[in-house]
Structure formats: C-alpha cells, structure tokens
Amino acid sequence: NLIIAYENYNIVRLNPWLLEPDTNYKITIGANTKDKFGQILGKPVVLDYQTGDLLGDISVPSGLNIFPSSQDLQLNISTVNLPESEYQATYKVVQPTDLVYTESAYPRNNRKNLLPTNEKWQKYPVSGEKNKITEVAIPLREKLGSQTGMLAYGVQARTSFSEQNGQEKWQEPEFYGLVQLTNLGVFAQW
C-alpha cells in the first residue's frame, strides 16, 4: 500500500518502496477528508514532494550455495549508487583439505581463514546508471579454472557514510560465501 496510516495515530506515511527515486510527486489530500471527530478538511491541500536518490548499496549471496555444474550459473553482485563506483573482492579456490579447519568463508580470530584480510582484496570498478541496480556476474567456472569445485569469496564496498560522535564513518557491508559447482546429486529449488 502506498499510504500507511493507523487508527488513533496522528501520522500518515507514504511507503518509500513504492516511490521512484529522484522524482517530483504532487500529493493531494481531498477536501472531503474527515478526521476521527467528524471534521471535514473543507478544501484540498496540495503538497509537492521530491524524492532523493537511492542510498548506495551492495548485495551478494552469502553462506553456502551449491549449483549443478551442468548449468552455467554465476555469482551475482548487485550494486546501486556506490559513491566510489567500485567494490573490493577476493576469490579463492577451496581444496578439500582447506575444509578440515574451517567450514565457512567468514573470517575467524585465532583460526585458519580461507580468505586474506580485506586490506589485500582487489578493487573492481562498477559503472551504472544513477538510481538503477547494476548486476555484475562473476563467472564461476572461470574463477575455479574447472567445471566443478568450490570457490570461497568475500565482497565489500563503501555504500554511505554517517556522522557518529562528530566523525564521519563509512558503512562498508561485507559478504562472505562459498559456492560449489558439482556434477553429483539432483538439483532442487524450493
């Protein structure tokens, strides 16, 4: 619903997920609008409302994903309005022996990690139209160098900054995951 209003509550909100970014809207509250006391507004109220740009964001599947090698599936990185027009990532082919000491690509203190620290990650440029989601497809077979295998990955980007205690602080979401291409089993999706 576009309008969010609750009974006995004096605030009416617009659902921001239903509005387009960087767009002018004209909002009209009708003259016949009645409050809980039965009072009628009497004449329409017209407001101009300008939405802003989408906040920078990045999204990447995390955790463990298993895909059939018979399909050419890829790892998708979704971005929008990244302020530095780039993300950082690292990829590592996982050997079965690597999984003896860890079961995840997430970094752990005082344990063996599959991936290097994010200071060593490579930067990748992202270009896209403002306020439009850009999909970057990571070719798994190419990264694996094989039709089957497991790949560990980490991805991060600066998305926005805020001020905390008088200092600017970047929001830098991080995503970690493992993706396996296999020719064993049956692929089921639900």
Question: Where are each of the predicted segments found?
Answer:
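C-terminal segments of large proteins
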Residues: 181-190
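Acidic, low-complexity Ser/Thr/Gly/Pro-rich repeat segments typical of extracellular/periplasmic
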Residues: 1-181
